[in-house]
UniProtKB/Swiss-Prot annotation:
The gene coding this protein: metE
Metabolic or biological pathway, per its Swiss-Prot or TrEMBL entry: Amino-acid biosynthesis; L-methionine biosynthesis via de novo pathway; L-methionine from L-homocysteine (MetE route): step 1/1
Gene3D superfamilies: 3.20.20.210
Co-factor binding comment: Binds 1 zinc ion per subunit.
Protein's recorded name: 5-methyltetrahydropteroyltriglutamate--homocysteine methyltransferase
Catalytic activity from the UniProt record: 5-methyltetrahydropteroyltri-L-glutamate + L-homocysteine = tetrahydropteroyltri-L-glutamate + L-methionine
Source species of the chain: Yersinia pseudotuberculosis serotype O:1b (strain IP 31758)
Length: 758
């Protein structure tokens, strides 16, 4: 039996972020829809060809998305929120962008769809909205059009479709509450129609993604799989596809399904391959996700060969990426500045395709030459284990010396709050922002010129100082109470810290999609982490010298730096987080010495770091909270520690949020209409809270009345004396005109509420 290989998906954005540039040009009115569509066509054709040339047997089609693949699925099913619908019920690419960005068909603002993390990754999807009695129809034929495109280009393909149960699981009920699973029978006819269309095109296999099967699903959701897949069987072969964790706990449900194959993630999952093989119907195809789609490390192909060889010829077998390569940068060959040793440890999406091809060839026709090729390929990643670039004895000693006293503040919150009130004397409903201000073309140009050597250090610092001065002046003029320096010097909240810490390396083109047109370039953690010198102190001290009002020191927390980097795989995540915490603990101490009295330690990724299964949560939360406290607890009692979290659902982790013992927490709540505050109310959260009062991901400017209404809603749940007033998130991606207007409205809303209290 010949083994084939395939990928579950490929990065969409393009090596030079061509998709991002085309999207933003179109949104700004600088290019036509046809020009945008052409960029998409060119990228798809290039990516299919590149995968095929790298040795991929079946290229995925349907993994491309103009904004997000879950949103694409919503449109496929005709699921468009009423506020975004065209008058004639038609669906086009503008419908898709309106849902993602927040505009009505008239051009007036309409709330964007809620956005949240895709399982435990750094990718965001647009949350489908469901209403009772909703109608579904095949509304958007992007998948079929792209299948036609790929077939016309002569590719051997495997269409990709998000499965019906995972799709419903990922959504939220809007309006009157009901069980969204009850919509299953309404969406299945659309899936049947799509599969019938694919069958007409001669498609043999369809990858139907059901990553919800790695979760601990309620029994009624598990029970829904059998009738759902009964309804979908017969027209094409279905490869039931799971990723991000193991499936052993749901194996009884899975093996009874009328599908022809199963894909499992054997990188993130811990399923025993022999047990899996034994438990599955013998005629099923088993696709093994052996190449990590979520990290940048070269695979040890020799080890995989040894592990997989016993399965060869025992059943139909495919090899694949563990998950979509969406989460990987595209091409390591474009990296010209990486040190040769470090570069030899990496593999990006195209190299991962080549790894699949190499391993498949060796398993199909093992001989000495092939095995030697695998050994030569695997040698650098094996040599890394003993590299001096990886190990730092001093860091290891410091980690071993941590005691329980190192992670506790000196006084409890109530006593600290009193000393902080005396020190800062802030008004009721204090206003602040989350940290960053608009990153103008001028700011980005300044950083780029400095990075590429066109600008010397002195002139760079002068330029950044001017932007900080402007940010402070703007905030003074607006009447904000606690200021920030605006982060003009920072390219990215994680990359900036990584650049100043030992143990990290950076890529030139290692872009991955975060959401919509937003791309990030995660640092890579290659070894033990330490801080050679202060990182943020110079700019924080300068900003504070410009104003009598308190200026926040701004740090990215240890868990977020870990979650938003490509981590090492040779030590635990806990070890990495605590190494970062120790480095940033020194930064907190230095900020205090420089006179900074309010220090924000952002942990937007705390929740997304949760393991997918609850059974594993407690261990993670314990070390994640300890890492934050290790970072913060060095602060004096009159230093106010803030933290910021976004895209979070808090209900199930409130104990841990409270255990962080931050003096103030700011959270993203506007898109969920203050829903998140219910968790804090039910828990009787003891410290101060800044619920985000407007959505910075949308260009819409909130009215004073809108903000006031949200704050009143917040005050029904949290005592007003413990409420802060702030946007949802940093303002880096917004323009100055809308930022000024939105913040002016926010300050005015706070002032009105203060006046009511007098």
């Amino acid at each position: 039996m010949t083994i084939l290989n395939h990928t579950l998906g490929f990065p969409r954005v393009g090596l030079k972020r061509e998709l991002k540039k085309a999207q933003e040009s179109y949104w700004a009115g600088n290019s036509t829809q046809e020009e945008l569509l052409n960029v998409g066509r060119e990228l798809r054709a290039r990516h299919w060809q590149q995968q095929q040339q790298a040795g991929v047997d079946l290229v995925p089609v349907g993994d491309f998305a103009w904004y997000d693949h879950v949103l694409t699925t919503s449109l496929l099913l005709g699921n468009v929120p009423e506020r975004h619908q065209n008058a004639d019920g038609s669906i086009d690419i503008d419908t898709l962008f309106r849902i993602g960005r927040g505009r009505a068909p008239t051009g007036k603002p309409a709330a964007a769809a809620e956005m949240t993390k895709w399982f435990n990754t750094n990718y965001h999807y647009m949350v489908p909205e469901f209403q009772q009695g909703q109608q579904f129809k095949l509304g958007w034929t992007q998948l079929l059009d792209e299948v036609d495109e790929a077939l016309a280009l002569g590719h051997k393909i495997k269409p990709v479709l998000l499965g019906p149960i995972t799709y419903l699981w990922l959504g939220k009920v809007k309006g009157e509450q009901f069980d969204r699973l009850s919509l299953l029978n309404d969406i299945l006819p659309v899936y049947q129609q799509v599969l019938a269309e694919l069958a007409k095109r001669g498609i043999e296999w369809v990858q139907i993604d059901e990553p919800a099967l790695v979760l601990e699903l309620p029994q009624e959701w598990l029970d829904a799989y059998q009738p759902a897949y009964q309804a979908l069987q017969g027209q094409v072969k279905l490869l039931l596809t799971t990723y991000f964790d193991s499936i052993g706990h749901n194996i009884d449900t899975i093996r009874a399904l009328p599908v022809q194959g199963l894909h499992v993630d054997v990188v993130a999952g811990h399923d025993d391959l022999a047990v899996l093989h034994k438990n599955l119907p013998k005629e099923w195809l088993l696709s093994l996700g052996v190449i990590n789609g979520r990290n940048v490390w070269r695979a040890d192909l020799s080890s995989w060969f040894e592990r997989l060889q016993p399965l060869v010829n025992s059943r139909p077998l495919w090899l694949g990426s563990s998950c979509s390569l969406l989460h990987s940068p595209i091409d390591l060959n474009e990296e010209t500045r990486l040190d040769a040793e470090v570069k030899s440890w990496f593999a990006f999406a195209l190299q991962k395709c080549a790894e699949l091809a190499l391993l498949t060839q060796a398993l199909n026709a093992p001989n000495d030459a092939k095995l030697a090729e695998l050994a030569a390929y695997s040698a650098p990643i094996r040599a890394r284990r003993s590299s001096s670039r990886v190990h730092n004895a001093q860091v290891e000693q410091r980690l071993a010396a941590i005691t329980s006293q190192d992670i506790e503040r000196q006084l409890p919150y109530e006593a600290r709050a009193e000393t902080q009130r005396k020190r800062f004397n802030l008004p009721a409903w204090p206003t602040t922002t989350i940290g960053s201000f608009p990153q103008t073309t001028e700011i980005r140009g300044l950083r780029l010129d400095f990075k590429q050597g066109r600008l010397d250090g002195k002139n760079y610092r002068t330029g950044i100082s001017e932007h900080i001065k402007q940010a402070i002046a703007e905030q003074e003029r607006l009447g904000l109470d606690v200021l920030v320096h605006g982060e003009a010097e920072r390219n990215d909240m994680v990359e900036y810290f990584g650049e100043h810490l030992d143990g990290f390396v950076f890529t030139q083109n290692g872009w991955v999609q975060s959401y919509g047109s937003r791309c990030v370039k995660p640092p890579v953690i290659i070894g033990d982490i330490s801080r050679p010198e202060a990182i943020t102190v110079e700019w924080a001290k300068y900003a504070q010298s410009l104003t009598e009002k308190p200026v926040k020191g701004m740090l990215t927390g240890p868990v977020t730096i870990l979650c938003w980097s490509f981590p090492r795989e040779d030590v635990s995540r806990e070890t990495i987080a605590k190494q970062i915490a120790l480095a940033l603990r020194d930064e907190v101490e230095d900020l205090e010495k420089a006179g900074i009295g309010i220090i924000q330690i952002d942990e937007p990724a705390l929740r997304e770091g949760l393991p997918l299964r609850r059974a594993d949560w407690q261990a993670y939360l314990q070390w994640a909270v300890d890492a934050f406290k290790l970072n913060a607890a060095v602060a004096q009692n009159d230093t106010q520690i803030h933290t910021h979290m976004c895209y979070c659902e808090f209900n199930d982790i409130m104990d841990s949020i409270a255990a962080l013992d931050a003096d103030v927490i700011t959270i993203e709540t506007s898109r969920s209409d203050m829903e998140l505050l219910e968790s804090f109310e039910d828990f009787a959260y003891p410290n101060e809270i800044g619920p985000g009062v407007y959505d910075i991901h949308s260009p819409n400017v909130p009215s004073v009345e809108w903000i006031e209404a949200l704050l009143r809603k917040a005050a029904q749940r949290i005592p007003a004396e413990r409420l802060w007033v702030n946007p949802d998130c940093g303002l880096k991606t917004r323009g100055w005109p809308e930022t000024r207007q939105a913040l002016a409205n926010m300050v005015l809303a706070a002032q009105r509420l203060r006046e009511e209290q007098i």
